[in-house]
Swiss-Prot record:
It is found in: Cytoplasm. It comes from Agathobacter rectalis (strain ATCC 33656 / DSM 3377 / JCM 17463 / KCTC 5835 / VPI 0990) (Eubacterium rectale). GO terms for cellular component: cytoplasm. InterPro entries: DNA-binding_RecF, DNA-binding_RecF_CS, P-loop_NTPase, RecF/RecN/SMC_N, RecF_2. The RecF protein is involved in DNA metabolism; it is required for DNA replication and normal SOS inducibility. RecF binds preferentially to single-stranded, linear DNA. It also seems to bind ATP. GO terms for molecular function: ATP binding; single-stranded DNA binding. This is DNA replication and repair protein RecF. Gene3D superfamilies: P-loop containing nucleotide triphosphate hydrolases, RecF/RecN/SMC, N-terminal domain.
Length: 362
């Protein structure tokens, strides 16, 4: 799949923008704070309805305006899709596919699959379990609408159960209603655990060869899914935890507490890995993500690289860019020196200055 073009109106620092991309390597360069990442953010929004930064809709609307518009033309398996997205200050987002409004984000997922790689992706490895759950969920939700539905229902049930736990502290007679939410939590949670385990196992099979190649065969990276509780024992553990849950007024077992372990040669690299090992593992993860998506949907996702090359040494840069021959890639950076020096193939170049984009090389 490819992004053919993006049109922006009152999005971030862009009053108007109409940009068309090459099918392979696109470079967007310019000084910091000129608007390079905003173009990638618009592309990511078009595939997921959310900002990769976690920004609210109103924060992405140009200062002084009431709404922003993004139009993205996508080509996938010889079929063209037009994705229109309206962001409004009141939070009422509107999305249409080929001029037909959609009611749920799930209707959009799968049309434009995005793999986004930025220096912040080191947080997947370095930070707490929430970052790794977020990574798993974002990818699975793009690939599997049933998973998206079960995850959404699980999260809603979790909120309701936690609210009830707080209410029981003041109204003990409500405790009999806890069983209703427990049954729903178990139903949706088991599906979430099962799919996450399958996803991590599949990703682990792919990532080992990629990481071995990047590290020159010196390291073996293993991913392991670490659920807070196995789906088989979920019901028993939820019952055992009930008194603790009532005391803390929150649900203490379930997939909302899962984690994923990154280990190199048996060592947990979140705790004990060098920054070089963590960067190599993050790169391996993103390249594995591309392969996994391609395997599952029979189409290559679009890769967005946000100022990530400056974080990689020459060997990692070479491996990354030489691995992308069949992948549309949009790269932001502050200059072109690395591309010229290493003679990387570049198909289209854009220069950004204060929200104005100029095509440098057709």
């Amino acid at each position: 799949m490819i992004i053919k073009s993006i049109q922006l109106s009152n999005f971030r620092n862009y009053e108007k923008l109409d940009i068309s991309f090459d099918t392979e390597t696109n470079i967007i360069y310019g000084d910091n704070a000129q608007g390079k990442t905003n173009i990638l953010e618009a592309a990511y929004l078009s595939g997921t309805t959310k900002s990769h930064k976690g920004s609210k809709d109103k924060e992405m609307i140009r200062f002084g305006e009431d709404e922003a518009h993004i139009r993205t033309i996508v080509e996938k398996n010889d079929k063209e899709y037009r994705i229109d997205m309206h962001l409004r200050k009141n939070g009422a987002k509107g999305v249409a596919i080929n001029k037909m409004p959609i009611k749920k984000a799930s209707e959009l997922f799968g049309i434009l699959n995005i793999v986004f790689f930025s220096p912040e992706d080191l947080n997947i490895i370095k930070n707490g379990p929430a970052e790794r759950r977020r990574f798993i969920d974002l990818e699975l939700c793009q690939l599997d609408k049933i998973y998206l539905s079960n995850l959404s229902k699980y999260n809603k049930t979790l909120v309701q159960r936690n609210r009830l736990l707080k209410d029981i502290a003041y109204r003990p007679d409500l405790i009999d209603t806890l069983q209703v939410w427990d049954m729903q939590l178990l139903e949706y949670g088991r599906h979430v655990i099962k799919k996450r385990r399958e996803f991590v196992n599949e990703l682990n099979e792919i990532i080992q060869d990629i990481h071995s190649n990047i590290s020159g065969g010196r390291e073996k990276l293993i991913l392991k899914y670490e659920p807070s509780i196995d789906d088989i024992f979920f019901e028993d553990e939820l019952l055992k935890a009930r008194s603790r849950d009532l005391k803390l007024c929150q649900t203490t077992v379930g997939p909302h507490r899962d984690d994923m372990l990154f280990s190199v040669d048996g060592v947990d690299i979140r705790k004990y890995g060098s920054q070089g090992q963590q960067r190599t593992s993050a790169l391996s993860l993103k390249l594995s993500e591309i392969s996994l998506v391609k395997k599952n949907i029979n189409s290559t996702p679009v890769l967005l690289l946000d100022d990530v090359l400056s974080e990689l040494d020459g060997n990692r840069q070479n491996y990354l860019l030489n691995s992308l021959s069949d992948t549309q890639t949009i790269i932001t950076c502050t200059g072109l020196d690395e591309f010229v020096k290493n003679r990387f193939q570049v198909d289209k170049v854009f220069h950004v200055v204060k929200g104005q984009v100029e095509v440098i090389d057709e």
